[in-house]
């Protein structure tokens, strides 16, 4: 019988994370000031061009535009270290960033239809982690793409989200920066690892078979995006993959700050109805996803991302050395129909939590 219990990962709580994790600060401290390429990327604005009342969702926020020329320069040159000023609540936060290697040219990117998986040429973003300059106890993860930025700053005072002010408008060049403690809406997602059905589920698969040794140096993820996520990103494989890699950069940054190395080995996007479409909760989705993964996958852990409203996330516990069936997790209800605002801190929390179950953190 496979044991599933509820574990509260310390990585979930930003105030625990930033108090304990110092790895990234140490890496940044090792870069001389002249080693940072300074990029003037953001320009604060006072009036939104989006037809949306942000005060319905937030009590405080900052709006900005981004220089497309500078953004393209950041993506194309992919400097080892950057310094970027972020407008925030009438002032600026200076981000000191260094290049992340959680996704590389060797990572695999596929789109899946009724005929199977097909590789596609994915234009990699520029992925970074770092800190806020002169602010101890901070941790930054941020990804730059040709027409998008996905970022989050973990601070003792809350999580600061950086993203397009309307994530449903792919053409928008307006960004919003806000502390998630000022959100007026509540995310009711929950972790399903305490589901009694999982605690009593008797596996059909022998966990002593197909067991493999996982490297202690880096945990590699196979990431799958369901059809609903693909639809929500305008049926764009690239935009959906940007969402996945941008999200996992945030997750990877949080783990790295606690000296746990992770990487994305493959991202697969469903472009047709997926095998999980009939599942109405995270429990059923996990069983379906685990069944799909039982034959093996490209990575150490498999993670399904879904924007369907399934109630949150769920995962098997402590499975790094188990059969492929169990090395899986589901993170659903990712910003599903709550607001056009970017809610990357919620998404990051769900994925980090469920991946932590798999690793027994």
Give residue ranges: language-model regions.
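N-terminal prosegments of processed precursors
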Residues: 20-167, 287
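Fold-level signature of zinc-dependent metallopeptidase catalytic domains
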Residues: 21-28, 32-53, 58, 170-326, ...
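Residue-level detector of short, conserved catalytic/binding motifs and their immediate flanks
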Residues: 82, 128, 149, 219, ...
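Structured loops at beta-to-helix junctions and adjacent beta-edge loops in soluble globular domains
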Residues: 98, 133, 154, 224, ...
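Active-site recognition of the HExxH zinc-binding catalytic motif
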Residues: 303, 349-361
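Short pre-active-site segment immediately N-terminal to the catalytic Zn-binding motif
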Residues: 332-352
